[in-house]
Amino acid sequence: GGGGQSFLAADNAVLVSTQCYKRHSYVEIPSNLLVQNGMSLKDGANLYVYKRVNGAFVTLPNTLNTQGRSYETFEPRSDVERDFLDMSEEDFVEKYGKDLGLQHILYGEVDKPQLGGLHTVIGMYRLLRANKLNAKSVTNSDSDVMQNYFVLADNGSYKQVCTVVDLLLDDFLELLRNILNEYGTNKSKVVTVSIDYHSINFMTWFEDGSIKTCYPQLQSAWTCGYNMPELYKVQNCVMEPCNIPNYGVGITLPSGIMMNVAKYTQLCQYLSKTTVCVPHNMRVMHFGAGSDKGVAPGSTVLKQWLPEGTLLVDTDIVDYVSDAHVSVLSDCNKYKTEHKFDLVISDMYTDNDSKRKHGGVIANNGNDDVFIYLSSFLRNNLALGGSFAVKLTETSWHESLYDIAQDCAWWTMFCTAVNASSSEAFLIGVNYLGASVKVKVSGKTLHANYIFWRNCNYLQTSAYSIFDVAKFDLRLKATPVVNLKTEQKTDLVFNLIKCGKLLVRDVGNTSFTSDSFVCTM
């Protein structure tokens, strides 16, 4: 019509039309993607977009289109999708590609303590239909390319956030085939894919010429943080300088909220999702509690998070005031106790250059001084079944801490979202099983793997999760606590410890000398 005429006469213009002019270059927007006043149009015509620059038609880029379906009201739109919902997993994988990692990516590994894979809406729908899944949407914007869900599988295997995409399954399989053909000889590759004209990065890992996993590198902006994917634990990286893509990018916190309050809030939010033991009269030790403000913000957050009746002991080398039950002002090396703890948190920071940093005055004597003490404290004073979170950075770390982490039922490196633009992470060990002689990956290699993860991933900084405090409190799990002799520590006992169902340590009253008073609980 008239719009078409004036478009053809203009040098620079964009035409959006329901007419398809085959002789000109265009992009097609399927009608099912169209939204009017927040309502998606159930039946409408496809739209065609044409663009002219300097009097000539421009070839517009190709993109994959999301389908805009939610997993609750999912309807298949192709034979491939119907096959996926009707066929057995074995038959579907056999028919459409054994080497595409479909078991992980489409079907999801539901039998692990942390749900693996499951990166498509149709995959979620399949599990939902079989009553194998509960999910709660956490982003409700229809303009997001990715949808984010809290996912809970019926056997308790869970994932904090599942980031899924709703592409037509035909398009998704073709995308996987193209990735495999182009990059299959690599070990890993970040592949940028245009979806709804947004550039989405897919992290892809290959093994023996097949895709092992392929997931969108997009965790929602309100996540409490990022934990290192399992695959980075088994790499064999060489130590390189930390070169974080968004290093030093600031974050605006609400007025009156200290960085450490936000950071500890996110650390606690993450620990709440693990199998950390929470007994009655829990005992928590917090190292490096002080701050340059003379207060202990981390202890305040911990006290708010921990159940009623928990004993919180904190310590720092610099003077500070604290909400903890017991505060010890001293060099950590001087702090000794016979008692064992259920959770140990450390925010101590040092590095091998600490003398120079402190103008010749030794606030602490470097990594060996601080972290060898901390390692020996964990070995001697962490209850079996207990957990720990120790702050490390590129230069403030020690290989012995990675050894202890590998003696836990599970471990990871966790970066809080508020501080994701620094090299800081908490080394988290969940459910300590005691010193073992099992073969471990060297701490140097693991630290290099951590740096490698940080160097090749952009972690979005965000403070959103600190507003999500309705369910902040750590749930009292009433984990049983027993004091066992060595010969009583059977396989059954270790299985209970491994699952976070038992703590082994001294029981009864504790006595601590605080800098202000003697405290017996």
Swiss-Prot record:
Task: Name the domain of life this protein comes from.
Answer: Viruses
Q: What is this protein called?
A: Replicase polyprotein 1ab
Organism field: Avian infectious bronchitis virus (strain KB8523)
GN (gene name): rep
* Stated role: The replicase polyprotein of coronaviruses is a multifunctional protein: it contains the activities necessary for the transcription of negative stranded RNA, leader RNA, subgenomic mRNAs and progeny virion RNA as well as proteinases responsible for the cleavage of the polyprotein into functional products.
Query: Mind listing the UniProt keywords for this protein, alphabetically?
Result: Endonuclease, Hydrolase, Methyltransferase, Nuclease, Transferase
Q: Which GO terms describe its molecular function?
A: endonuclease activity; mRNA (nucleoside-2'-O-)-methyltransferase activity; RNA nuclease activity
Domain NendoU, first and last residues per copy:
75-216
Q: Which InterPro entries match?
A: AV_NSP11N_COV_NSP15M, EndoU-like, NendoU_nidovirus, NIV_2_O_MTASE, NSP15_middle_sf, NSP15_NendoU_CoV, NSP16_CoV-like, SAM-dependent_MTases_sf
Do you know which Pfam families this protein is assigned to? CoV_Methyltr_2, CoV_NSP15_C
Where is the catalytic site? Answer: H104, H119, K159, K263, D347, K391, E424
Kindly give the Gene3D superfamilies that the UniProt entry links to this protein.
3.40.50.11580, Vaccinia Virus protein VP39
Task: Cite the EC number.
Answer: 3.1.-.-, 2.1.1.-
* Domain AV-Nsp11N/CoV-Nsp15M per the UniProt entry, residue ranges: 1-58
Annotated positions for site Cleavage: Q219, S220
Q: Does the keyword Cytoplasm apply?
A: no
Q: Which SUPFAM superfamilies match?
A: EndoU-like, S-adenosyl-L-methionine-dependent methyltransferases
- List each copy of the Nidovirus-type SAM-dependent 2'-O-MTase domain by range: 219-518
One GO BP annotation is: viral translational frameshifting
